[in-house]
């Protein structure tokens, strides 16, 4: 497997970000209440810069046993653990980047049931222990690119989705894979209150073409930084598709269903002109409200010191995945 393009040491997310008092900075910058009328995705990052000093701790899940295949151990500098666990989009726990870390402790992840059904010869049901014991786990250092034009580099731990799907034996009718997050309003305040949850229709759903799901890069992820996923990162199991925008990485999955038809996906239902089904990272296809040509890392000096770098086609994984889309108009099928 070819090496991915490297990032500079200076581009790494630093150890501190949530250090400025929101009210003080908003006042200093003259940001008025009108800013809050912007669509959420356009201002969510801005507001998250102005958190206090109550940063959540790094992941504290149980240690996992895993290998480190050389193909996935590259020279990409890692985003610090406290940023991966403390700067998240998980609207089931609130809209602000720090809300998931603050609120996701209410999610009960054991016991857990994950069902694989639909166009398969052998439907499966996995429990919590199966997720970490049934398949050999490996650490993979992947880029993570949010549609909001920020990015991280994360050492995920998991197993290839194709190994799980192979056990279920997809039928010849299977063309797509549909994923569904747990629906538990009593544990997830955003599912209970539309204001907290951004007005989305829950449970959160996502989907892939079958060939995308079977690609070796597509990872069923159960850990990060050597330990089990914390709830705010999608415990106990989430999807990572590194060449796609982060909203494709559905969290806290309870259902995987193979289908004949393309499944609905949450953000595409909300705004089909802004969030496509494919959601491949592409610097040449802008979001209607912002450019995707560059991306930003959360810097150490605050909002005025953010460092930007060019966005890579397919998030730097073009050598591995571009053939999946041969002949497909990437502007039309965004």
UniProtKB/Swiss-Prot annotation:
Modification after translation: Predicted to be exported by the Tat system. The position of the signal peptide cleavage has not been experimentally proven.
Intracellular or extracellular location(s): Periplasm
Residues engaged in binding Mo-molybdopterin: 88, 91-92, 146, 181, 233, 238, 249-251
Enzyme superclass (EC): oxidoreductase
A GO molecular function held by the record: metal ion binding
Cofactor annotation: Mo-molybdopterin
Catalysed reaction equations from the record: L-methionyl-[protein] + a quinone + H2O = L-methionyl-(S)-S-oxide-[protein] + a quinol; L-methionyl-[protein] + a quinone + H2O = L-methionyl-(R)-S-oxide-[protein] + a quinol
Keyword Metal-binding in annotation: yes
Secretion signal span: 1-44
Record-listed E.C. numbers: 1.8.5.-
Predominant location: periplasm
Keyword entries, A-Z: Metal-binding, Molybdenum, Oxidoreductase, Periplasm, Signal
GO cellular component: periplasmic space
Function: Part of the MsrPQ system that repairs oxidized periplasmic proteins containing methionine sulfoxide residues (Met-O), using respiratory chain electrons. Thus protects these proteins from oxidative-stress damage caused by reactive species of oxygen and chlorine generated by the host defense mechanisms. MsrPQ is essential for the maintenance of envelope integrity under bleach stress, rescuing a wide series of structurally unrelated periplasmic proteins from methionine oxidation, including the primary periplasmic chaperone SurA and the lipoprotein Pal.
Record text on subunit structure and interactions: Heterodimer of a catalytic subunit (MsrP) and a heme-binding subunit (MsrQ).
Protein name from the UniProt record: Protein-methionine-sulfoxide reductase catalytic subunit MsrP
């Amino acid at each position: 497997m070819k090496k991915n393009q490297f990032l500079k040491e200076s581009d790494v997310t630093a150890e501190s970000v949530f250090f400025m008092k929101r009210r003080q900075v908003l006042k200093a910058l003259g940001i008025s209440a009108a800013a809050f009328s912007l669509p959420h995705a356009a201002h969510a990052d801005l507001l998250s810069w102005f958190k206090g000093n109550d940063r959540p701790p790094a992941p504290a899940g149980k240690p996992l046993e895993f290998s480190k295949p050389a193909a996935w151990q590259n020279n990409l500098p890692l985003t610090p653990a406290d940023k991966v666990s403390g700067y998240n989009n998980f609207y089931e726990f609130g809209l602000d980047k720090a809300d998931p870390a603050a609120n996701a402790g209410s999610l009960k992840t054991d016991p857990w049931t994950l069902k694989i059904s639909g166009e398969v010869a052998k439907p499966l049901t996995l429990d919590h222990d199966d997720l970490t014991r049934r398949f050999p786990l490996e650490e993979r250092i992947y880029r993570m690119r949010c549609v909001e034009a920020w990015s991280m580099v994360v050492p995920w731990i998991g197993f290839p989705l194709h190994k799980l799907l192979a056990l279920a034996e997809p039928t010849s009718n299977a063309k797509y894979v549909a994923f569904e997050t747990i629906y538990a309003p009593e544990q997830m305040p955003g599912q209970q209150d539309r204001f907290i949850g951004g007005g989305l229709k829950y449970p959160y759903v996502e989907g892939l073409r079958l060939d995308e799901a079977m690609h070796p890069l597509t990872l069923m992820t159960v850990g990060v930084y050597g330990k089990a996923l914390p709830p705010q990162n999608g415990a106990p199991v989430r999807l990572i598709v590194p060449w796609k925008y982060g909203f494709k990485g559905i969290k806290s999955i309870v259902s995987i269903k193979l289908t004949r038809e393309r499944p609905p996906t949450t953000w595409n239902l909300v705004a089909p002109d802004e969030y496509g089904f494919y959601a491949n990272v592409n610097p040449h296809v802008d979001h209607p409200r912002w450019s995707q040509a560059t991306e930003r890392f959360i810097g150490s000096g605050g909002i005025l010191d953010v460092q930007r770098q060019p966005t890579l086609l397919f998030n730097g994984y073009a050598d591995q995945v571009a053939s999946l889309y041969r002949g497909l108009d990437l502007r039309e099928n965004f």
